[in-house]
Design a protein with these regions (language model features):
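N-terminal active-site segment of His-dependent metallophosphoesterases
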Residues: 26-97
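Active-site-proximal beta-strand elements of phosphoester/diester hydrolases
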Residues: 49-59, 141-150, 174-176, 227-233
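The substrate-binding groove and active-site-proximal loops of carbohydrate-active enzymes
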Residues: 55, 86-89, 146-153, 186-189
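Bacterial N-terminal signal peptides that target proteins for export
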Residues: 2-12
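Active-site glycine-centered loops adjacent to acidic/histidine catalytic or metal-binding residues
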Residues: 57, 84-85, 116-117, 178, ...
């Protein structure tokens, strides 16, 4: 009976993933193009030593964002993960501009975007990618799970998606979503509905590292034993007052060497 139950859960998770994909994605999105590049890159890099870059909130400052992309490129990353708010209103014109910068500066790097609260969901689904997605590699022992919480809550379908994806274990599992959970340290512009369920799930599954964005600073915390980072300094106006962390333009470079994970915050001058 236990084996049947486990199989049933796997099937349910697979159906859920397909459902999210069919609802949230169309052909020829940035996600699809990047996934093809990533699959090729996974075969090229050494499982013993590879790097990826995380950044977020690039709206309203193309000059800084271009510097951010150029800096990220120098690390020869396996992929770049953008934490959302690539635009102010998510229009097609803004999306054209964003894609032109990405394609012009890092055309060869797989580029994945977590949906933010400034995005237009219709445009995002048609041109950027799904609202929930998972990057997975058995060869690299790597799993990156991105979940939509741009409405300041983690809804039941997203929580179910997250739990399904966490059930498939990898040596290093990362979780990303745009808005940070409310904690004693992070108590402004954060979300509460579903936050306890989120942090419990991450702790119970021994997630390697959680990435959040939205608040335009760099900050670190440990939440129920899970290392957590806010990285939202890719161009949007910095959150100078009232927030924990360092209000600087920056990227986070993640290095996985012999299965051990290290991170480095690298500043960018305006």
């Amino acid at each position: 009976m236990q084996r049947i139950g486990k199989f049933s859960r796997i099937v349910s998770c697979a159906v859920l993933v397909l459902l999210f994909w069919s609802v949230n994605s169309q052909a020829a999105t940035l996600y699809e193009r990047s996934l093809e590049k990533l699959q090729a890159g996974i075969e090229r890099v050494s499982p013993a030593d590879f790097t990826f870059v995380v950044l977020g909130d690039s709206r309203d400052n193309d000059g800084v964002f271009k510097k951010i992309l150029a800096l990220a490129k120098t690390y020869n990353p396996l992929f770049i993960l953008h934490g959302g708010d690539y635009s102010n209103k998510g229009s097609n014109t803004e999306t054209d501009n964003f894609l032109a910068m990405v394609d012009g500066i890092v055309p060869e790097v797989p580029f994945f975007v977590v949906i933010g609260n400034h995005e237009n969901k219709k445009v995002f689904a048609e041109r950027i990618g799904p609202f929930n997605f998972t990057l997975d590699s058995a060869r690299l022992k790597l799993r990156v799970i991105a979940v939509d919480n741009e409405n300041y809550l983690l809804k039941d379908p997203e929580l179910e998606y997250l739990n399904c994806q966490l059930a498939a274990k990898r040596e290093n599992t990362f979780v990303a979503m745009h808005i940070p959970p409310r904690t004693e340290r992070w108590n402004l512009h954060t979300f509460s509905a579903g936050a306890a369920e989120l942090t419990n799930a991450l702790a119970e599954n021994a997630v390697t590292l959680a990435f959040y964005f939205h608040i335009h600073v760099y900050d670190r915390d440990v939440i129920k034993g899970v290392p957590s980072i806010i990285t939202a300094g890719a161009g949007a106006p910095l959150s100078v007052f009232g927030f924990s962390g360092e209000p600087v333009y920056h990227i986070v470079v993640v290095r996985v060497k012999n299965d051990a994970v290290s991170t480095e915050m690298v500043k960018v001058n305006e």
